[in-house]
Amino acid sequence: MKFIDQAIIHVIAGNGGNGCVSFRREKYIPKGGPDGGNGGDGGNIWLEANNNLNTLIDLRFKKKFQAQNGQNGSSRKSSGKKGDDIKIHVPIGTKVINYQTREIIGDLIQHKQKMLIAKGGWHGLGNARFKSSTNRTPRQSTLGSIGEKRDIQLELMLLADVGTLGMPNVGKSTLVTNISGAKTKISDYPFTTLHPVLGSVNIQKNKKFIIADIPGIIKGASYGAGLGIRFLKHLERCKLLLHIIDLVPQNNCHPSDNIKTVLNELKKYSLKLYNKPRWFIFNKIDLLSVEELNQIIKEIIFQFKIHEKYYLISSMKKIGIKKLCSDITKYLKK
């Protein structure tokens, strides 16, 4: 299924039903008094998070949702039926924004969590409600109010504990696949990963974390080049970022050049994301001699003044993976 992480929908809640003007008319009761009933409330429109969904694709084809109007009141003090509500299912992690005002209405981050996005109109009052000691035959009633209508922007931001970032083809997908079993495409051409993928990493019983793999970032991404910058928002909820670095890059650049590219694009995108806890993960150590490896790591640590944790791994050969996952679990428990 195609991954869609944005949608704009137009929602119209139901109008409230009108109150009724009516008088009781029965044999032998010439002055039965007012018996006009109230109208029914208009139907509401809700969003509900569903953990069986992982895309907003359905909302790209159906953009307008209109709830049912409340029915009008009738005689014998009969109230109109309330309009039926509409419930729109969205993936967990959906951010809800008022499209016109840009106000963030809220986030849906738990299964079956509900959010009211358009409230139905109030019911109108029938004339029975206006009877008093001084007005025994009221002829007034009220109209039901208009239901809310608005445009809602939905943005899916995946919920993951850990996120991976780096240039294309640095081994992010291989790492995520090997530690979680997530089904992510792996090949030797750029942008193999076309959309974010989530994987669940189970270390031991009650010890697990969710990891997100997003498309690679290239130079100029913040100006629209490549794919990765669009999906960086999916890392905003992560508690830890893993910057995967290919020690034998296919673009014939020194690894430090690629590190600089990713960090520059990350900084341009969001300082908040740039300042998130980040570990450097040096991948493909199996393709270098010990001397070459030590020299490159020494140069990178000196150039970038790395004080954060860093790891030497081979995602293909699964070298250093167990230690990395164990340390991630410990970090997330802090």
UniProtKB/Swiss-Prot annotation:
UniProt-listed PROSITE patterns: G_OBG, GTP1_OBG, OBG
Pfam families, A to Z: GTP1_OBG, MMR_HSR1
Cofactor names: Mg(2+)
Keywords noted in UniProt: Cytoplasm, GTP-binding, Hydrolase, Magnesium, Metal-binding, Nucleotide-binding
EC code(s) of this entry: 3.6.5.-
Domain OBG-type G: 160-333
Residues holding Mg(2+): 173, 193
Primary site of residence: cytoplasm
Molecular function per GO: GTP binding; GTPase activity; magnesium ion binding
Residue positions binding GTP: 166-173, 191-195, 213-216, 283-286, 314-316
Subcellular location: Cytoplasm
UniProt-listed InterPro entries: G_OBG, GTP-bd, GTP-bd_Obg/CgtA, GTP1-OBG_CS, GTP1_OBG_dom, GTP1_OBG_dom_sf, OBG_GTPase, P-loop_NTPase
Sequence segments annotated as region (Disordered): 67-86
Alphabetized SUPFAM superfamilies for the sequence: Obg GTP-binding protein N-terminal domain (SSF82051), P-loop containing nucleoside triphosphate hydrolases (SSF52540)
Biased composition (Low complexity): 68-77
Domain Obg: 1-159
GO biological process, alphabetically ordered: ribosome biogenesis
GO CC aspect terms: cytoplasm
Protein origin, superkingdom: Bacteria
Enzyme class (EC, first level): hydrolase
Biological role stated in the UniProt entry: An essential GTPase which binds GTP, GDP and possibly (p)ppGpp with moderate affinity, with high nucleotide exchange rates and a fairly low GTP hydrolysis rate. Plays a role in control of the cell cycle, stress response, ribosome biogenesis and in those bacteria that undergo differentiation, in morphogenesis control.
Family of this protein: Belongs to the TRAFAC class OBG-HflX-like GTPase superfamily. OBG GTPase family.
Subunit text: Monomer.
The protein's name in its UniProt record: GTPase Obg
Organism: Buchnera aphidicola subsp. Acyrthosiphon pisum (strain APS) (Acyrthosiphon pisum symbiotic bacterium)
